[in-house]
Amino acid sequence: MKEYLDLLNLILKNGYPKIDRTKTGTLSMFGYQIRINLNEGFPLLTTKYCHFKSIVYELLWFLRGDTNISFLKKNNISIWNKWADKNGNLGPIYGKQWRAWEDKKNNTIDQIEIALNKLKKEPSSRRILVSSWNVGELDLMSIPPCHVLFQLYVINNKLSCQVYQRSCDIFLGLPFNIGSYALLTHIFANQCDLLVEDLIWTGGDIHLYKNHLNQAKLQLTRSPLPLPKIFIKKKPKNLFNYAFNDFLLIDYNHHPKIKAPISI
């Protein structure tokens, strides 16, 4: 994806040195937008290997409303291990907020179900939003949400999604986040018999950790390859019944993996 490489190059050249919570140090910039036409292929980075299995299982985990890593560990996904407590709990992170946001009357609100119903019954609505940024529960989370909000938009029977990410690790996180929200858009479209259109990613504090500089420079020496395609094999009776094997990634050709440490 040239759009991603352009942002990576921009932050290498113009990013401001900034001390961060992890004490690793970053090059940082504020505010940027990428628009990806999902009809041109599934936006999984080709200039390094991205683990599609982790993207799928994490998204299915979110959609289950789960906040314990046991489901991920059962499927050999370790991406959340370092943030979990000794019992595997992460507090009321994404899954809890998406599926069971608590109101002041102690009722729970299923934002995903509401969004799905609006897409089916009122696709022109400007209120098809899902938020993870529950101010009243931030201090109970192992880490506050990085991608905090997404909005769905339908025109001419085509579905677009815009996501706002307050904090973005551009080297390790962003390729994963783009893949995840692209897949989520395809899932909503599949459930609602819509076509897909655009994924719009909007970033707040976008940062390249200083222990990722050499990896970023290596990646910029590589030329993007044609994007893969995504095929959803069936339409389950509801959005929460998808399984990993329902998704087929076709023709994912990529450059070799580039290892980089995670800052916690």
Swiss-Prot record:
GO BP annotation list: dTMP biosynthetic process; dTTP biosynthetic process; methylation
Entries under CDD domains matching the protein: TS_Pyrimidine_HMase
Top-rank EC class of the record's enzyme: transferase
EC number(s) from the headed UniProt entry: 2.1.1.45
Keyword check for Cytoplasm: yes
Pathway of action: Pyrimidine metabolism; dTTP biosynthesis
Stretch forming the signal peptide: none
Binding site for (6R)-5,10-methylene-5,6,7,8-tetrahydrofolate: H51, D169, S263
Entry-linked NCBIfam families: PRK01827.1-3, PRK01827.1-5, thym_sym
Name the record gives this protein: Thymidylate synthase
Species for this entry: Wigglesworthia glossinidia brevipalpis
